[in-house]
């Protein structure tokens, strides 16, 4: 019970994912119109976007439709219980994923202690994945698939499970991998004249599950689309599709190494299906950061299965473990990190959305990628967005990057020409990519360029609004307030996420470029005062500022 409460607490942070908002709006659209969002009703750039590569139209349709059931369920949770309902739905889905890891580990090892420890190990890996996205259903259904296959009871449920899964998220093909591993094990056992129990039911139900997963808006295109994802330049910009960093060793890599080592040690007793699953999901984890959560399921299960020591913990150790779990629950509750049944409004441009809504602005806008979903939720149908996290068009994304980073004419149209081409009369943007600290150069470029076309009409710590034609009664702000906004924005993120200080480094560089050396030194000092990777270049620059008295 204590481990279950701890898991729920760990997996219930506030809603902090920018993609959540477009999933929520899409779910509302599906529920209220009883139709799929095809063609795209939310972004004005989608319809006219030319295909950048063969197959992009199929990818676009897939991205618009493959999560429809999960999106409708998330919206239903929101409509029933607001943001607390969404947070608890996510926590329960992930806790069930971890609980199934514990159940399978317990069933295989026969040791209850191994079960709850495997569940907690899965939870430790799952914490960064506590995001309100449809792939939560893939995590749960993958775990359910293995649990059903392990018990060999109710194999007839597999086709129904895969039917639901294939309409919640395109990751249902990962279930095929699990089915294939168990079917291959059964086939080899049959060839060795040692047939496994329920082998006929296993093959029939697995075949039924694969066929049932084709009953969705895209049929069996998920694998084709995945291959197209890997060749997409746009996907290469998304951090979740990047290969995971392996130094210092992350927790998933340590668990994977421990599981692999244990299986090699016990190789004579390791099941064929386990070797296949370890290899398949280890490969997936090394290909993309987003896949590392699956190691959090399989590695603890395999560790519990093959560790040679089978005894339960001594009574004293059990009491110590219970005390540690209770202390963790108390710490999380008192620190305010557990059961945060709200949206992290500080991350989103709520003030900017209020401004646009109150002035009934309907002009086309250019917006930053991470704000597209929130603006879609707040402003549609009066306003449609330029871009959002659905990643629907390679060409639009290329133009977006040229505008955002204020590219010149080299290699294509410059930012001003592209804004004219798209008919954008409003710009809603933040000024940093906080993971890397990269400055979005468009805003400081507009502020420091002699021009009268764009007026700064709104700014707070979350967003800036520039307009060509401000509403009546709105007095433009001093464009140099962009730099004050950048300071406010970076300061807010440092308060909330002190482990991501690179915006301060980039802000120092921005001030150095306009010869504001006092401010450059101040922000470089702030960066160096926060946790950061070794950065001799920044340390040298700071010493030079100090020695020069700047």
Give names to the regions the model predicted:
Residues 7, 122-126, 143-148, 156-170, ...:
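Membrane-interface alpha helices of multi-pass inner-membrane proteins
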Residues 31, 173-268, 296:
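Transmembrane catalytic cores of multi-pass membrane glycosyltransferases
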Residues 45-84, 88:
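Short hydrophobic/aromatic helix or loop-helix immediately within or flanking a transmembrane segment
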Residues 88-109:
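Transmembrane-helix motifs of polytopic, lipid-linked glycan transferases
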Residues 129-137:
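Short acidic/glycine- and proline-prone juxtamembrane loop motifs at membrane-interface regions
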Residues 143-156, 259-269:
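Membrane-interface transmembrane helices that cradle and orient dolichyl/undecaprenyl
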Residues 206-210, 301-332:
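Signature aromatic-anchored transmembrane alpha helix within multi-pass, membrane-resident enzymes
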Residues 337-343, 347-370, 380, 384, ...:
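C-terminal luminal/periplasmic domains and tails of membrane-associated envelope-modifying transferases
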């Amino acid at each position: 019970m204590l481990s279950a409460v701890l898991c729920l607490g760990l997996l219930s942070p506030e809603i902090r994912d920018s993609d959540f908002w477009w999933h929520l709006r899409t779910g509302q659209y599906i529920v209220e119109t009883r139709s799929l969002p095809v063609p795209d009703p939310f972004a004005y750039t989608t319809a006219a976007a030319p295909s950048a590569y063969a197959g992009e139209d199929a990818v676009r349709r897939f991205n618009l439709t493959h999560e429809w059931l999960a999106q409708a369920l998330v919206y239903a949770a929101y409509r029933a219980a607001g943001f607390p309902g969404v947070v608890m739905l996510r926590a329960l889905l992930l806790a069930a994923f971890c609980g199934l890891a514990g159940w399978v580990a317990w069933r295989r090892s026969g040791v209850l202690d191994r079960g709850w420890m495997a569940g907690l190990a899965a939870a430790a890996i799952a914490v960064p994945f506590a995001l309100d996205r449809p792939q939560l259903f893939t995590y749960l259904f993958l775990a359910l698939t293995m649990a059903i296959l392990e018990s060999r009871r109710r194999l007839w449920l597999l086709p129904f499970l895969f039917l639901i899964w294939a309409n919640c998220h395109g990751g249902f093909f990962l279930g095929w991998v699990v089915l294939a591993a168990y079917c291959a094990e059964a086939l080899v056992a049959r060839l060795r004249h040692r047939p496994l129990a329920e082998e006929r039911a296993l093959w029939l139900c697995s075949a039924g599950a694969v066929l049932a997963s084709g009953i969705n808006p895209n049929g069996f295109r998920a694998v084709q689309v995945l291959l197209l994802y890997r060749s997409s330049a746009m996907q290469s910009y998304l951090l979740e599709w990047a290969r995971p960093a392996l130094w210092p060793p992350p927790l998933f890599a340590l668990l994977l190494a421990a599981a692999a080592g244990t299986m090699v040690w016990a190789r004579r007793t390791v099941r064929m299906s386990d070797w296949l699953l370890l290899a398949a999901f280890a490969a997936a984890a090394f290909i993309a950061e987003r896949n590392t959560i699956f190691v959090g399921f399989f590695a603890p299960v395999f560790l519990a299965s093959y560790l040679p020591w089978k005894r339960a913990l001594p009574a004293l150790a059990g009491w110590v473990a219970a005390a540690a779990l209770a202390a963790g629950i108390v710490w999380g509750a008192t620190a305010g990190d557990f059961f945060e049944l709200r949206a992290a409004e500080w991350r989103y441009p709520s003030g900017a959305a209020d401004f646009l809504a109150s002035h009934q602005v309907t002009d086309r806008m250019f917006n930053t990628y991470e704000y597209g979903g929130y603006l879609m939720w707040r402003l549609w149908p009066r306003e449609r967005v330029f871009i959002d996290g659905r990643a629907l068009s390679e060409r639009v994304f290329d133009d977006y990057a040229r505008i955002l980073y204020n590219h010149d004419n080299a290699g294509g149209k410059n930012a001003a020409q592209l804004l004219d081409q798209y008919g954008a009369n409003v710009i809603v943007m933040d000024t940093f990519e906080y993971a890397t600290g990269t400055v979005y150069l468009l805003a400081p470029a507009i502020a420091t360029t002699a021009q009268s076309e764009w007026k700064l009409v709104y700014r707070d710590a979350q967003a800036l609004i520039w307009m060509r034609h401000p509403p009546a009664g709105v007095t433009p702000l001093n464009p140099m307030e962009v730099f004050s906004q950048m300071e406010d924005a970076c300061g807010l993120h440092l308060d909330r996420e002190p482990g991501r200080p690179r915006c301060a480094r980039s802000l120092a560089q921005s001030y150095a470029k306009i010869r504001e050396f006092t401010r450059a030194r101040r922000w470089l000092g702030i960066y160096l005062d926060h946790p950061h990777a070794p950065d001799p270049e920044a340390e040298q620059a700071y010493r030079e500022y100090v020695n020069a008295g700047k």
